[in-house]
Design a protein with these regions (language model features):
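Thioredoxin-like thiol-disulfide oxidoreductase module
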Residues: 50-81, 86
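A short, hydrophobic beta-strand/beta-hairpin element that forms part of a small beta-sheet core
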Residues: 81-97
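Local sequence-structure signature of Cys/Sec-based thiol-disulfide redox active-site neighborhoods
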Residues: 4-45
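Basic/polar N-terminal segments that are highly enriched at the extreme N-terminus
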Residues: 1-5, 117-119
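Short, intrinsically disordered, mixed-charge
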Residues: 23, 27-30, 56, 60, ...
Length: 119
């Protein structure tokens, strides 16, 4: 088994129930203009089952952040690179999946396959 790794996903969206409602409506009413593909491919009204199962069955630690949380974790430098997946290792944040790759995924299965390949 591989070592436990610290994986951080950062949504290109704000957190909170009000923003969740607005984002959900935006995804369905105008999906082509929605700016968070990570949200788009991992959530419908709730977390998609395949994605949820992957996260829950993994031995890695996952953290999910929203725009307003970047400064709490010293990640302001990534504000223009969202959505993104990072790995925290030895106090540094390394990019696992950059914005371009994240935005290329058509569904959660492509994201899961990419993560399995990299982890």
């Amino acid at each position: 088994m591989n070592n436990k790794r610290n994986i951080i996903f950062i949504y290109n969206a704000k957190g909170g129930q009000w923003n969740y409602l607005i984002d959900t409506l935006h995804k369905y009413l105008s999906p082509k203009t929605y700016e968070c593909n990570l949200c788009q491919i991992t959530y419908d009204l709730k977390m998609r089952k395949a994605w949820k199962d992957f996260i829950e069955e993994s031995h890695h630690d996952y953290k999910f952040l929203h725009l307003e949380e970047l400064s709490d974790f010293g990640l302001e430098g990534f504000i223009n690179d969202l959505p993104i997946c990072l790995e925290k290792s030895n106090g540094k944040h390394n990019i696992l999946i950059d914005k371009n790759e994240m935005n290329s995924f058509q569904d959660e299965y492509e994201l899961i396959a990419s993560l399995k390949n990299k982890l």
